[in-house]
C-alpha cells in the first residue's frame, strides 16, 4: 500500500459497500437520501445514527458522522439546516487543544464526558458565527503537530 490512506483496506471496502447499498436500496441515490432528510442535519442524524444505523457502519459514529456532515456542506455543496447542532468531536487532539486554550482545565479533561466538552465549545463559540465543527480541522492539526505554533 503506497500511501496508507486506508489503514484497514478490506474492512473499509466492506464498510463503504454497505453504506452505498443502504443508500441505493432505501433512497436510490445520495441526492434522494439528502432530500429525505429535508436537508436537515438533525433528521439526517436520526436516519444514520438511529433508524438505519446498521446500514451505516463507521459513519454512524458521532465523530465520523459529524465530520462527514460538515464535509457534505463544505465540499459537497449540501446546505444543511441546523449546522450549528453539529458538535465538535472531542477526541484526544481536540481535548488537548481545549486545555491549551482554556476551554476546559486539565482536571476537567480527565473527568468531563465528550458531550460536556462539546457543549463547552458550543457555548464558547456562541455569537461568533463559527460552528463548533468548523474548529475541528485546525485544532486537530495544531495538536497533531505538537502545538508547533504558539499563542
Model-identified regions with their sequence ranges:
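HhH-family (HhH-GPD) DNA N-glycosylase catalytic core used in base-excision repair
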Residues: 1-151
Amino acid at each position: 500500500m503506497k500511501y496508507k490512506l486506508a489503514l484497514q483496506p478490506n474492512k473499509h471496502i466492506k464498510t463503504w459497500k454497505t453504506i452505498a447499498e443502504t443508500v441505493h436500496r432505501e433512497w436510490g441515490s445520495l441526492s434522494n437520501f439528502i432530500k429525505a432528510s429535508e436537508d436537515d442535519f438533525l433528521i439526517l442524524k436520526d436516519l444514520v445514527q438511529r433508524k438505519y444505523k446498521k446500514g451505516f457502519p463507521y459513519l454512524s459514529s458521532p465523530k465520523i458522522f459529524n465530520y462527514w456532515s460538515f464535509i457534505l456542506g463544505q465540499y459537497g455543496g449540501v446546505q444543511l439546516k441546523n449546522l450549528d447542532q453539529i458538535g465538535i468531536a472531542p477526541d484526544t487532539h481536540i481535548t488537548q487543544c481545549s486545555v491549551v486554550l482554556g476551554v476546559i482545565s486539565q482536571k476537567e479533561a480527565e473527568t468531563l464526558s465528550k458531550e460536556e466538552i462539546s457543549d463547552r465549545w458550543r457555548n464558547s463559540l456562541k455569537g461568533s458565527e463559527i460552528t463548533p465543527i468548523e474548529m475541528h480541522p485546525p485544532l486537530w492539526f495544531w495538536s497533531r503537530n505538537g502545538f508547533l505554533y504558539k499563542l
